[in-house]
Amino acid sequence: KVAIIGGGLSGLVLARNLDDSSKVTVFEKSSGVAGRMATRLVEPFEFDHGAQFFTARSEAFKNFLLPYLEKETVVAWNPKVVTLEEGKKPYKRPWFETHYIAQPRMTSLVKALGAPVDIRLNTKIDEVFKQDNSWSLKSAGKTIGEGFDWLISSAPGNQAFEIFNKSGITLKGLDEVEYSPCFALMVGLYSELSLGFDAAVVKNSPIKWIAANSTKYGRRKEKALVIHSCNKWAFEQMNEELPHVQSLLENELFKLTDVSAKDVSCIDMARWRYAKVERE
């Protein structure tokens, strides 16, 4: 028996690889799987507010993707990409390798992986302990799984450290993993607005990325924008209230594009504390 903490891509890939030889249970603290490959629905809009795309560089990962490419759960994304900078003319930014997305939303790949797996949602593991050569897990002070031969965490290093440290287990180096954060601003527009790009890399701004989510293959037609902040800027703003950060990013978006406040139908925010690994 194997227990895996975390229902993101890495946790569910591992679960599927072990599924033939072991009885696997995945424990996920959120209401759905996907982790940083998340999609948020704010009717009638949808936003891939986590990972925007992924690349495949190793032969192992390319082979892993083949069945999902055949089923079109994963497709190549070929957007018109530009570089934006306030006060300067945008210029085209070519991509020199294939970029992939899951469809009809980024969660689709992880959900396909997790379909045959025993997944316990809304289950935040806060303590683990070993007794008689088997592992047990606690959530909200109650034992919710026991008798596991192996325990594996795919959670961010800081979260895994908290779980194991509380349990009196020291894993060398786990508390030394460093992450940088990111804010995601999600903007739904009343109607079609010509931005002149499908995606933009932004320079010298609190914003580093803008994507017209609705231009991705298989997405809803409602015009939806996903804006990611710079990691360094996000770190500096990490303890600010979300409405304040939202206002700053919103104003920056208006400066960089033809979007204005009157175009905005809905707006939402997300705070990614563990967006990017800086040091392992």
What are these regions (language model features)?
Residues 1-26:
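N-terminal Rossmann-like FAD-binding beta1-loop-alpha1 element of flavoenzymes
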Residues 17-42:
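Glycine-rich FAD pyrophosphate-binding loop
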Residues 39-82:
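N-terminal FAD cofactor-binding segment of flavoenzymes
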Residues 247-248, 254-280:
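Flavin (FAD/FMN) cofactor-binding core of flavoprotein oxidoreductases
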Residues 121-135:
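A conserved short coil-to-beta-strand element within the FAD-binding core of flavoproteins
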Residues 34, 144, 148-198, 259:
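Central helical "cap/lid" subdomain
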Residues 186-238, 243-258:
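Active-site substrate-recognition segment that forms the wall
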Residues 53-59, 88-112, 239-248:
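Short beta-strand to alpha-helix junction loop
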